[in-house]
Amino acid sequence: MVTMKHKNITILTIVFSIAIIFVSCNSTNKKLDEMKNKSKSGSDNTQSNDTTPKVTGIGGIFFFSDNPKELKKWYSNNLGLETNEWGSTFEYRNANRPEEINYLQWSPFKKGSEYFAPSKKEFMINYRVQNIEGLVKKLQTNGVTILDKIETYDYGKFVHIMDSEGNKIELWEPIDHVLTKVGGKTTK
């Protein structure tokens, strides 16, 4: 018999596995050096001026926890995550701009937090996007529920939407160089 606790552990395992796969799919240092050399020689075709409103990756994985502080400690002690007050920040390289460091935030939230509302789910995914204003217009045209207005911070722009199954989604147009300047320990 599968209990709710086992279902929650399974969901967390799947979500965490996705995050690890995403973060580990980054360019190797050799590939990074090759791309930098191409860029210096002017033959780099990886740069893109594409401003199509779309998702470009996963920006964060958020989920409920009975005790976020203890859970962060468990992940740090057992899986080697570098933790901070929000969870753990994964660092990886942008495949199109290898000199650019990007981030993925992993965060346990205290069970019952209103941050996921109006969703009834125990998780929320943050997607990295480009051209958030254009994306919001596209979503409005498509009849998608937009929960709030775009909010701007030093480290990027955010808006929340609902998908067709009632999952709250956070969209983030990041300004990664600001996060890089802030520094702090990251999981690599």
Model-derived regions: residue spans:
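Bacterial N-terminal signal peptides that target proteins for export
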Residues: 2-12
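Hydrophobic helical h-region of N-terminal Sec-dependent signal peptides
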Residues: 14-19
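C-terminal motif of bacterial Sec signal peptides marking the signal peptidase cleavage site
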Residues: 21-24
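Vicinal oxygen chelate
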Residues: 26-66, 85-86, 113-188
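Core segments of cupin and vicinal oxygen chelate
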Residues: 52-53, 62-107, 157-159
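Residue-level signal for short segments within beta-strands and strand-turn junctions
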Residues: 94, 110, 173-175
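A short, acidic/glycine-rich surface segment
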Residues: 109-115, 179-180
